[in-house]
Amino acid sequence: MGISIRQATINDIQAMQNANLHNLPENYQLKYYMYHILSWPQASYVAISYGVQENGEDSGNHGEITDPKGDSTYVNKNEKVIGYVLGKMEDDPEAEDKTPHGHITSLSVMRSYRRLGIAEKLMRQSLYAMCESFDAKYVSLHVRKSNRAALHLYRDSLKFEVTSIEKSYYQDGEDAYAMRLDLKIEELLPSTAQDGEEDDLSKDLLENL
């Protein structure tokens, strides 16, 4: 089994939606994924697990029983979407802030593939692309106040800063932290790898920059 990160395409949107439905309470229709990918194709990425055996079992043995024929996380029989980042550029002509900036709409990694550094690498790829392709000066996002793992990633690993608390931001009434990161392209390279699998991901990320 191997894991790689590549730019998301229209062919990935059903698998991306499935990864979203499995992991997050904030869900979107397929047309919303399509809107992002068609409008800002450089800003969204997927993490792919490949090397699936002919019997449908993932050779990486992450504790999953897999069936490519019946599992919508598969793009094809050899590629399983295990995570994604959905990004966009803010383009509201009536907004007071005219500075070009991006927004992370959604980030998700399947539970059995967490703690491999995949979420951080997806984020770095998207942030780099927004900076390089769209000249984004900063990126914003929202995160649930209760989501400690995401807060650790954004605040401690990626150095986002909390700019405000938005009351009852989510449909269930939970507050959100509004966060922001000023983009510096030289700071968006992969972090030091902890093990062989992370090292492969870092190499893949560098090759896509």
Regions found by a protein language model. Give the residues of each.
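C-terminal interaction modules of eukaryotic adaptor/scaffold proteins
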Residues: 175-182
